[in-house]
């Protein structure tokens, strides 16, 4: 714990005091090449830390704004498909990627969707239990 305390109380303040931040804009003209390098290294580190901290929140916003259903029953406020369980037969595959031309049944469109997006979605397969 003493090691961490020394870093926070001694080394970080010493480093921040050594960063060559001029008092005015004209002071930037007086900086040497070594001071510019030190200033760029510090600025780059701060920018990278801010980017790494903010990036996950920006990605979530982009994901939230993307539509899942691009074309199926867009005139409806909610897409609902009812299927009588007695009509299923032995095996049926339902689409979960919303790309099927035979929606709600799967036509294998998820394979192209997965290839294009890197997703791993597949169909919902309902199968009668073998007795």
Curated annotation (Swiss-Prot):
Residues 1-35 are lumenal. Belongs to the CISD protein family. CISD2 subfamily. Pfam families: MitoNEET_N, zf-CDGSH. Signal peptide: none annotated. [2Fe-2S] cluster binds at residues 95, 97, 106, 110. GO terms for molecular function: 2 iron, 2 sulfur cluster binding; metal ion binding. This is CDGSH iron-sulfur domain-containing protein 2 homolog B. Binds 1 [2Fe-2S] cluster. The keyword Membrane applies. One of its GO terms (cellular component) is endoplasmic reticulum membrane.
